[in-house]
Amino acid sequence: YDPSPLQDFCVAD
């Protein structure tokens, strides 16, 4: 889980 603003759509888990 990486709460990155760039991958916020990908790390919703």
From Swiss-Prot:
Q: What induces it?
A: Increased by salt stress in roots and decreased by salt stress in coleoptile.
The record's Gene Ontology biological-process terms are: cell wall organization
**This protein's GO CC annotations:** apoplast; cytosol; endoplasmic reticulum
Q: What is the annotated tissue distribution of the protein whose record heads this document?
A: Roots and coleoptile. In roots, present in the mature region, but not in the tip. Not detected in leaves.
- Among its keywords, does the record have Secreted? yes
Q: Which family does it belong to?
A: Belongs to the germin family.
The name this protein goes by in its record: Germin GS1
